[in-house]
Amino acid sequence: IIAIANEDKYPTMSVFKFHIAVTALKKMEAENIPLDKMVYIKQKEMLKNTYSPLRDKYPDQGIRISYRDIIKYTVSISDNNTCDWLIRFVGGIDKVDSYIKSLGIKDMNFTETEESMHTDIMLCYNNWSTPLAIAQLLKKLHTENILTKEHFAFLETAMLDCVSGKNKLIAGLPTDIKFGHK
């Protein structure tokens, strides 16, 4: 892997949702939780002052939803409420940070949730990564069987289905190019 401008710490912004999804899927594997298991997200967990297509679809109520759909909302649509739900599910943002670092990915740091970043936008700089660290995690996912084949394929599809950033990363690429991202 060749890295350019890798000495800087770049705020991950919503890219950290990828790391959260990897951590959540790994916890699901460890606890034998199927993707289609239903859970209940309480209305009070659906914060109003943040980007949340799920909350907009089901306003002023809790919702029964599968882990599969929570991860899709988080990765493919960039929903902040489902992101924070996954952070709570894995045991906190520090669990995401320590799990990714346990894989040998060191040049990154996660200390903030979507909720905390919305209270103070400057906190987004506390969640950072080098470009190489993200590339290393992607490579490990492809080469080291970190996730089961089912979970890897699911996450890959969620990334390919990502609706955000169409005017940035993939703008101008031929339409037959497959480009997965978060």
PLM region descriptions:
Residues P11-V39, T74:
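Active-site SXXK
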Residues I1-N6:
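A short, well-structured edge-of-sheet supersecondary motif
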Residues M46-D84:
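Conserved catalytic neighborhood of penicillin-recognizing serine enzymes
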Residues D84-T143:
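Mid-domain, small-residue-enriched loop/turn segments at the edges of structured enzyme/sensor domains
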